[in-house]
Design a protein with these regions (language model features):
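N-terminal segments that mediate ammonia production and transfer
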Residues: 1-191
């Protein structure tokens, strides 16, 4: 990981550093970020949380995206459901998430927190069900925070507090958009 960081030449990146889910194989097809072509161009996606896999989740995924699934994770299936909803929403990410949150409501999930990197923006999604959080996790485990300092905007979840005196909480049920060219930041309600 550190070797890759020292060689990377990019203005934007997303990283998902965590322990692997116990029952799933540790292999490239199960590794974040997931990257696909979409109506928005190339899109990269990482997810922190758990979504019950099964018929309810599969019903939200178009057949072509279902056929492209490579791994076994709920995260990849959630991403395919997002891509399906993006298609239905003509690439409007806010509208796609507003619909997706409604579609996910009857599905058992802890969190559909995500970071999404497109050709034009970085998007951070905060949507979780505190009542479904495992008791061994800290109460703020799925809470998300962000800050902008000297033109650099960063976002993080549990355990990371780069500057405890200068950060904003991203409200549960909201989405943060960062324009990659201008650095402009906007928030939107999604749930």
């Amino acid at each position: 990981y550190s070797d890759m960081l020292t060689q990377m030449q990019s203005t934007d990146a997303i990283a998902h550093l965590r322990w692997a889910t116990e029952e799933l194989a540790v292999c490239i097809p199960n590794t974040h970020p997931f990257v696909k072509k979409s109506s928005m161009g190339e899109i990269a996606f990482i997810h922190n949380g758990g979504v019950a896999r099964g018929d309810s989740l599969n019903a939200l995924i178009d057949a072509d995206y279902q056929a492209e699934l490579e791994g076994d994770t709920d995260s990849e299936q959630y991403f395919a459901a997002l891509l399906t909803q993006l298609r239905k929403s003509d690439g409007d990410l806010v509208a796609a998430y507003q619909a997706l949150v409604k579609d996910f409501a009857p599905i058992n999930y802890t969190s559909i927190n995500a970071m999404i990197l497109t050709e034009t923006e970085l998007v951070i999604v905060c949507q979780h069900k505190p009542e479904n959080r495992s008791p061994e996790l800290q109460p703020d485990y799925y809470d998300l925070f962000w800050q902008s300092i000297e033109g650099v905007t960063s976002a993080w979840s549990s355990g990371v507090r780069p500057n405890p005196n200068n950060f904003n909480e991203l409200k549960n049920g909201s989405l943060l958009r960062i324009n990659r060219k201008t650095g402009d930041v906007t928030t939107h309600e999604i749930g």
